[in-house]
């Protein structure tokens, strides 16, 4: 089954959106496999966003991510990477549809509440970085009510 990495950024944590965001993924039928509240240092944030290191907004992004605790999560389910991105909404909240997390809770691109893996391969890399200890192996008793 496919897995994705989801991070509630410092603004989402500070604004008390953790439960709401977790609820959206649970209600969709995805299974939470890993969860931690953590404040990361600059080196870790730079490693996570290394693919963006040449962008002019890189330093501001890193400063933002290290400004407070984040909630790092691993979610599992059929098509969870693609569907997770749809639940999250467009990177720019002003382009996000109402009903998406960013469409409902964010205004500025620099405070867009949440990160989600953009592909299966990036999800694997991000999960390995954030959860080197591995994640929980379990199956919900609702699995047969969600999947054929």
Curated annotation (Swiss-Prot):
Tell me what this protein is called.
Nucleoside diphosphate kinase 1
SMART domains the record matches:
NDK
Recorded GO molecular functions are:
ATP binding; metal ion binding; nucleoside diphosphate kinase activity
* PROSITE patterns in UniProt: NDPK, NDPK_LIKE
Q: Which cofactor does it need?
A: Mg(2+)
Similarity section: Belongs to the NDK family.
The organism's taxonomic lineage, starting at the top: Eukaryota, Viridiplantae, Streptophyta, Embryophyta, Tracheophyta
Q: What keywords is this UniProt entry annotated with?
A: ATP-binding, Kinase, Magnesium, Metal-binding, Nucleotide metabolism, Nucleotide-binding, Phosphoprotein, Transferase
**Record's superkingdom?**
Eukaryota
Gene3D superfamilies with a match to the protein in the record: Nucleoside diphosphate kinase-like domain
Which positions are annotated as binding ATP? 9, 57, 85, 91, 102, 112
Active site (UniProt): 115
Q: What does this protein do?
A: Major role in the synthesis of nucleoside triphosphates other than ATP. The ATP gamma phosphate is transferred to the NDP beta phosphate via a ping-pong mechanism, using a phosphorylated active-site intermediate.
What SUPFAM superfamilies is this protein classified in? Nucleoside diphosphate kinase, NDK
Secretion signal, residue range per the UniProt entry:
none
EC code(s) of this entry: 2.7.4.6
Q: Which reaction does it catalyse?
A: a 2'-deoxyribonucleoside 5'-diphosphate + ATP = a 2'-deoxyribonucleoside 5'-triphosphate + ADP; a ribonucleoside 5'-diphosphate + ATP = a ribonucleoside 5'-triphosphate + ADP
Q: Which InterPro entries match?
A: NDK-like_dom, NDK-like_dom_sf, Nucleoside_diP_kinase, Nucleoside_diP_kinase_AS
């Amino acid at each position: 089954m496919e897995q994705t990495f989801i991070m509630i950024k410092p603004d989402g944590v500070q604004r008390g959106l953790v439960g709401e965001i977790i609820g959206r993924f649970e209600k969709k039928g995805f299974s939470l496999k890993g969860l931690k509240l953590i404040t990361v240092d600059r080196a870790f944030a730079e490693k996570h966003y290394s693919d963006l290191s040449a962008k002019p907004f890189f330093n501001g992004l890193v400063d933002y991510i290290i400004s407070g605790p984040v909630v790092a999560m691993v979610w599992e389910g059929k098509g969870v990477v693609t569907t997770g991105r749809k639940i999250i909404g467009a990177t720019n909240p002003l382009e996000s549809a109402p009903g998406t997390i960013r469409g409902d809770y964010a205004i500025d691109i620099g405070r867009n509440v949440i990160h989600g893996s953009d592909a299966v391969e990036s999800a694997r890399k991000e999960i390995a970085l954030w959860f080197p200890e591995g994640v929980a192996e379990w199956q919900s008793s609702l699995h047969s009510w969600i999947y054929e």
